[in-house]
Swiss-Prot record:
Similarity section: Belongs to the FGAMS family.
Subcellular location: Cytoplasm
InterPro entries the UniProt entry points to: PRibForGlyAmidine_synth_PurL, PurL_linker, PurM-like_C_dom, PurM-like_C_sf, PurM-like_N, PurM-like_N_sf
Cellular component, GO annotation: cytoplasm
Organism the protein comes from: Caldanaerobacter subterraneus subsp. tengcongensis (strain DSM 15242 / JCM 11007 / NBRC 100824 / MB4) (Thermoanaerobacter tengcongensis)
Protein task: Part of the phosphoribosylformylglycinamidine synthase complex involved in the purines biosynthetic pathway. Catalyzes the ATP-dependent conversion of formylglycinamide ribonucleotide (FGAR) and glutamine to yield formylglycinamidine ribonucleotide (FGAM) and glutamate. The FGAM synthase complex is composed of three subunits. PurQ produces an ammonia molecule by converting glutamine to glutamate. PurL transfers the ammonia molecule to FGAR to form FGAM in an ATP-dependent manner.
Annotated residues for binding of ATP: Y44, K83, D488, G525
GO process terms (BP): 'de novo' IMP biosynthetic process
Name by which UniProt lists this protein: Phosphoribosylformylglycinamidine synthase subunit PurL
Binding-site residues for Mg(2+) 1, renumbered to this chain: E85, N526
Biological or metabolic pathway of the protein: Purine metabolism; IMP biosynthesis via de novo pathway; 5-amino-1-(5-phospho-D-ribosyl)imidazole from N(2)-formyl-N(1)-(5-phospho-D-ribosyl)glycinamide: step 1/2
Record keyword Electron transport present: no
Binding-site positions, Mg(2+) 2: D109, D260
The EC number(s) this enzyme carries: 6.3.5.3
Length: 733
């Protein structure tokens, strides 16, 4: 076979392993099946040994990692279903379809579990939009997400977007979907019942996306442009029909098991379901509805055509299934049956064209513990001499520059393209600390966020990853939600490089430590490696998707200033940390220093305090202090509430560091004057420092530091800078 396995991404050792499993050389169809199932994208062969360190158990966990999505109990016989996935490589090549099918795929993962999807979030990373290609990627990724979500009628309620040089040419598109299901109606992908029919439902099968999973397990290069056929094409209207047909099907007792067809198409759905159930499956390819003529067994088994599901049905119920799908104008074809021998047997024209043990494709995939070493530049990049950072003269200009930086400026240009109000349950819309979606027929709501500062993770993956978890949990607490579960998307470079494996390992350890401390289980997730462009890796970017529970939706809090004369209080301690900060990057062009330190116990106390203050109705607004420090948080709350602020700070720090330090575990709250003493007392009981720093008043932002006026600007001037930046960047030539 002239080492064709290498072209399919398999190593010589892996090929030898396949021969020893089968006791013979594989044919081309079998080789294709192994190449996709043993790719990093499907097998997690470089990350699985590390992922076992993540905490996955908890009192609310109904389903942890290993199924199509994670499931958490939220009481009242309801559960929340959540998952995040990447579509980075396809989006780099064909951004519109890459992003759109990323959204389509994650939605299918949710309704496969029996849940109705209620919200989408997207976590995006791009290069600096100062060249045509980057702008093209941004425009088309956002349009792809918007069109798919808007057409299928699921609101895109939140997410996060960062712009850094390291993502140029390799953008990150991580899509998260959340659904609600009654606990006794959860569906799983565990095939059982010898002789039960296997059906493919939904769209027809074509040649799109063949080998997409293997493609997603390689570095991007000049040649990647030629791999556009590896990018699938999505049809959101077809998916809407598929969603409704599946939910109607789940109301019957016909379904034994169901799995969506994502990466590796029919191959992965068949072997994953069979191996979970300890059974085999026989598939007759002549019965698969095709949209193109002359397709080979290899092409049919590896096609990643969208909007398809594989269903194991109770014997004799085939007609019931066909009736439902016919009503919705969709295919439902019986293509095979469950067998007792543990083999995936594929038949075409009456002949066996592939026959492999199901478990050999899934559980027996190789696993690698790679060599690691600390990157040679790591110590150097952490060094920051504060004397290199001269205190600026004009602090008004600095404040304008920081809040109009790409990472802090309003992302309205992006989210205004999304319909975030469809289904009418969105309580807190994009642009706030966390999105909130109410659950119909209850007083409950779910708060959602995605977070990760890749720059911190570049400077220190262990600490940066802890901060990503802490920031996500803090964002949920700011709206009054108790964090209940994590879904993570680990975006890294090539793990075969020792420095990258070191980043991946330390990042996972950091996430594990933070999740254990906060007692938040990781219930699902995704790993995306080989994110490199012309040999340069992206910043390590472990995106944390998190859900929080609000028992009473009337008690939520938001970040906008509400009332004149309210007292502004900072919770938490400013340690004067500008390493890795937005201030350092924007005003001095530096990405260096230690990222802010994080004390997880202090963070926990802050979060518990804010939840108590919100629950008891003692505060009028709350906003976490993160990128851009106190000054950015102040301006964001002021803009959101259309009210100015007068601030007076006493500090031993330099004025610029006091304002723009990104020290963790801090929040900005506003309190009615008569409640201030009670708030300070409760903060003291929680051992959280609390400092009165000013009042909400007027239409200007005025800041005095140690008695000296440092900043005095009309809010509308700041708002203009903050609101207009991304639109301006995207429209200029």
């Amino acid at each position: 076979m002239n080492k064709i396995w290498r072209e399919l991404g398999l190593t010589d050792e892996e090929y030898e392993k396949i021969i020893s499993i089968l006791g013979r050389e594989p044919n081309i169809t079998e080789l294709g099946m192994y190449s996709v199932m043993w790719s990093e994208h499907c097998s997690y062969k470089n990350s699985k040994p590390l992922l076992k360190y993540l905490p996955t158990k908890g009192e609310r966990v109904i389903q942890g990692p290993g199924e199509n999505a994670g499931v958490l109990d939220i009481g009242d016989n309801l559960a929340v279903v959540m998952k995040i996935e990447s579509h980075n490589h396809p989006s780099a090549i064909e951004p519109y379809q890459g992003a759109a099918t990323g959204v389509g795929g994650i939605i299918r993962d949710i309704f496969t579990m029996g849940a109705r999807p209620i919200a989408l979030l997207d976590s995006l990373r791009f290069g600096i939009p100062d060249d045509k290609r980057t702008k093209y990627l941004i425009e088309n990724v956002v349009a792809g997400i918007a069109d798919y979500g808007n057409c299928i009628g699921i609101p895109t309620v939140g997410g996060d977007t960062y712009f850094e040089e390291s993502y140029k040419g390799n953008p990150l598109v991580n899509a998260m979907c959340v659904g609600i299901v009654e606990k006794d109606k959860i569906k799983k992908g565990i095939a059982k019942g010898i002789g039960n029919p296997v059906m493919v439902v939904g769209a027809t099968t074509g040649r799109d996306g063949i080998g997409g999973a293997s493609f997603a397990s390689q570095e991007l290069s000049e040649e990647s442009e030629e791999k556009r056929p590896s990018v699938q094409v999505g049809d959101p209207f077809m998916e809407k029909l598929l969603l409704e047909a599946c939910l109607e099907l789940f109301e019957t007792d016909a379904v034994v098991a169901i799995q969506d067809m994502g990466a590796a198409g029919l191959t992965s759905s068949s072997c994953e379901m069979a191996s979970r159930g300890g059974v085999g499956m026989e598939i007759d390819l002549d019965k698969v509805p095709l949209r193109e003529e002359g397709m080979t067994p290899y092409e049919i088994m590896l096609s990643e055509s969208q909007e398809r599901m594989l269903v194991v049905v109770k014997k004799g119920k085939e007609e019931d299934v066909q009736k439902i799908f016919k009503k919705w104008g969709l295919n439902a074809a019986t293509i095979g049956k469950i067998t007792d021998d543990g083999m995936i047997r594929v038949i075409k024209d009456g002949k066996i064209v592939a026959e492999v043990p199901a478990k050999s494709l899934t559980e027996d995939a190789p696993q690698y513990v790679r060599e690691e070493e600390v990157p040679k530049w790591q110590e150097e990049v952490k060094k920051l001499d504060i004397n290199e950072v001269k205190p600026p003269e004009d602090m008004n200009k600095v404040l304008k520059d920081v809040i109009s930086s790409l990472n802090i400026a309003s992302k309205e240009w992006i989210y205004s393209q999304y319909d975030y109000m469809v289904r009418t349950d969105t309580v807190i819309t994009p642009g706030m600390d966390a999105a909130v979606v109410r659950i119909k027929g209850t007083r409950k709501a779910i708060a959602l966020t995605t977070d990760c500062n890749g720059r911190y993770c570049y400077l220190d993956p262990y600490i940066g990853s802890q901060i990503a978890v802490a920031e996500a949990a803090r964002n949920l607490c700011m709206v009054g939600a108790k964090p209940i579960g994590v879904t993570d998307c680990l975006n890294f470079g090539n793990p075969e490089k020792k420095e990258i494996y070191w980043q991946l390992k330390n990042s996972i350890f950091g996430i594990a430590k933070a999740c254990e401390t906060f007692q938040i289980p990781v219930v699902s997730g995704n790993v995306s490696l080989y994110n490199e462009n012309e040999g340069e890796a992206i910043y390590p970017t472990p995106v944390i998707g998190m859900a929080g529970l609000i028992e009473d939706v009337s008690k939520i809090c938001t970040m906008d200033f509400k009332k004149e004369r309210d007292v502004i209080i900072i919770l938490g301690e400013n340690k004067g940390e500008i390493g890795g900060s937005e201030y350092l990057k924007v005003c001095f062009g530096m990405v260096k220093g230690q990222p802010p330190q994080i004390d997880l116990e202090k963070e926990k106390r802050l979060q518990e305090l804010v939840l108590k203050l919100i629950d008891e109705g003692l505060i009028n607004s709350s906003h976490d202090i993160s990128e851009g420090g106190f000054a950015a948080a102040l301006v964001e709350s002021a803009i959101a509430g259309k009210k100015g602020a007068k601030i007076s700070l006493q500090t031993s720090l330099r004025a610029d560091i006091e304002l723009f330090s990104e020290s963790q575990s801090r929040a900005l709250i506003t309190v009615s004057p008569e409640k201030v003493d009670e708030v300070l007392k409760i903060a003291y009981e929680h051992q959280v420092p609390a400092q009165k720093v000013g009042v909400v008043e007027g239409k200007d932002i005025v800041i005095d530091v140690n008695g000296k006026r440092i900043i005095d600007l009309p809010l509308e001037v700041l708002e203009e800078s903050w609101r207009g930046r991304i639109k301006w960047e995207m429209e200029r030539n």
